[in-house]
């Protein structure tokens, strides 16, 4: 409907760039990359490390953020999250960003936009492992930027502003129905490193202690 598109295009989805709204993307399409495919893999561990498994991935996440303390993921599920496509990557306000469009319903009998409260959106993120998906999208984008912009390895995340999940059935111009996050630098760097080189509990504890 017309109201839906007005709400979508006028939604102010970037907390750190309050003047930005989605309609601006269509005025500058050269800064947009839709359906950006990626493939992350679990590399062979270097000396002194062990292969990153689903349980060690959960341990890594929990070390940085207590929200993950009840996080459970099978090896099959983990492999599924390592390959995919980012719905939209774009440049705005001097940073690079990720958008993921979601169509989840909260109430299958009587779903209304008003149901998409911050608490309900947080529950959708947690229950569907979208928080993990978001972090892996940012690892993938970090790597792409380092290659395409010829940035020194380990610096790509500094150019990223964060990721926004837009739940389309609840979105409005005040950003209801959206979830924004920019995980800690140390978490993204740790995930990137452990995927490439294997897990190290000693390194994890050291990085989590000084995480920013």
Question: Can you say where each PLM-predicted feature lies in the sequence?
Answer:
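Structural signature of nuclease core domains in nucleic-acid processing machines
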Residues: 1-212
